[in-house]
Amino acid sequence: MKRGGRDSDQDSAEEGTAEKPKRPRTTQERSQPCDWGNLLQDIVLHVFKYLPLLDRAHASQVCRNWNQVFHMPDLWRCFEFELNQPATSYLKATHPELIKQIIKRHSNHLQYVSFKVDSSKESAEAACDILSQLVNCSLKTLGLISTARPSFMDLPKSHFISALTVVFVNSKSLSSLKIDDTPVDDPSLKVLVANNSDTLKLLKMSSCPHVSPAGILCVADQCHGLRELALNYHLLSDELLLALSSEKHVRLEHLRIDVVSENPGQTHFHTIQKSSWDAFIKHSPKVNLVMYFFLYEEEFDPFFRYEIPATHLYFGRSVSKDVLGRVGMTCPRLVELVVCANGLRPLDEELIRIAERCKNLSAIGLGECEVSCSAFVEFVKMCGGRLSQLSIMEEVLIPDQKYSLEQIHWEVSKHLGRVWFPDMMPTW
């Protein structure tokens, strides 16, 4: 009896200590909404960083907490102002009220800023108006981009320079500056150098007619950390290449040169000494030297007369067989070649010479040119699988006794190690 009593007491104790089943949630509890406003601001901030500005603005209206996150400095480091006139552009512009709010509440937070303007003078003026108000910010990058014609050039030079100088003076750590197609001049570049010489790493200023060779030389002499530079050929000089090759200067990584002629016979193109190129490539052996040519045939005489360290060549107008032949002889570092037009004389010998001497060539594009199918196959065979980009219009290839258009893609594919077809001209 006692044993039985003890067993009974033990069973009762175990039942008492057993976990009670959870009470199911009532319908009222299940339907109670979550309070999203109580999310940690760090979490909301992380989500907001992935949202477009318009969606972020809508989300900021959910509650006071989210609105506070919307105005946090981290979300306003980078901004692109899009300035367009409805009458001349179909692109959506940044709302004027938003621009006012940014200048009022976030101008001191901005660090990475770009302006995209359409072809109207009014849009360029609006960009300058915003620039002139950025007196409390220190930008790291600035880009002025004309999406159509260069509308900044329509402004009075003094008005543009005044606005740009505000940024140069107040930004003490500017590292990237893109001001192509603008009326920037030598004195404004001196202001840039005086305030940002230790930090400037990238400068793109193609088609800036008010800058002289002395002006860009001042930048190269003082900005020893400059790694990327884009300019027009008339600003290139032996002195500039030697300044970029000095012991104080870091190794340049990218140099783009635009060689442009608007009026045939009226533009004089000077010659750069071979010794200057040699010093430049010795100092920066891995530099990408990109050259865009928009010249008429008779204007190529000063170019490709001796070896130059060009890696990327783009010919935007018709270029003669003779010039392309000289390219094969003088550009051993060539990586990419694009020829928009040549004429009706086949480029067989020129392509073979380029394949023989340009051992790093990995990309080629041919537009309105002519090449025999046999020469093209031989060219691909010599280059082999290193041709990662091969863009040739079908009209360029001329069938011969050895290959037809139907046969050539098999032969080229075999040497490339991948399936290849010539580009087709759209029929619409």
From Swiss-Prot:
| Gene that encodes the chain | Fbxl3
Expressing tissues: Ubiquitously expressed but enriched in brain. Diffusely expressed in the suprachiasmatic nucleus, SCN.
**Which keywords appear in this protein's UniProt record, sorted alphabetically?**
Biological rhythms, Cytoplasm, Leucine-rich repeat, Nucleus, Repeat, Ubl conjugation pathway
Q: What is the effect of changing C358S?
A: In after-hour (afh) mutant; lengthening in circadian periodicity
Question: What is the recorded function of this protein according to its Swiss-Prot or TrEMBL entry?
Answer: Substrate-recognition component of the SCF(FBXL3) E3 ubiquitin ligase complex involved in circadian rhythm function. Plays a key role in the maintenance of both the speed and the robustness of the circadian clock oscillation. The SCF(FBXL3) complex mainly acts in the nucleus and mediates ubiquitination and subsequent degradation of CRY1 and CRY2. Activity of the SCF(FBXL3) complex is counteracted by the SCF(FBXL21) complex.
Q: How does this chain assemble? A: Part of the SCF (SKP1-CUL1-F-box) E3 ubiquitin-protein ligase complex SCF(FBXL3) composed of CUL1, SKP1, RBX1 and FBXL3. Interacts with HDAC3. Interacts with CRY1 and CRY2 (phosphorylated). Interacts with KDM8.
Gene Ontology cellular component terms for the protein in this record: cytosol; nuclear body; nucleoplasm; nucleus; SCF ubiquitin ligase complex
CDD domains reported in the protein's UniProt record = F-box_FBXL3 (cd22178), FBXL3_LRR (cd23957)
F-box domain: which residues?
Answer: 34-81
Query: Effect of gene disruption?
Result: Mice show defects in behavioral rhythms with an extremely long-period activity phenotype. The onset of active phase is abnormally delayed from the light-to-dark transition: in constant darkness (DD), mice show significantly longer rhythmic activities. Mice lacking both Fbxl3 and Fbxl21 show an attenuated phenotype in behavioral rhythm compared to Fbxl3-deficient mice; however, they exhibit unstable behavioral rhythms, sometimes eliciting arrhythmicity.
**Annotated metabolic or biological route of this protein:** Protein modification; protein ubiquitination
Span list, region Disordered: 1-33
Tell me the InterPro entries matching this sequence.
F-box-like_dom_sf, F-box_dom, LRR_dom_sf
LRR repeats span 119-146, 181-207, 208-233, 234-259, 316-341, 343-368, 369-394
Q: Which domain of life is it from?
A: Eukaryota
Q: What is this protein called?
A: F-box/LRR-repeat protein 3
What's any GO biological process attached to this entry? proteasome-mediated ubiquitin-dependent protein catabolic process
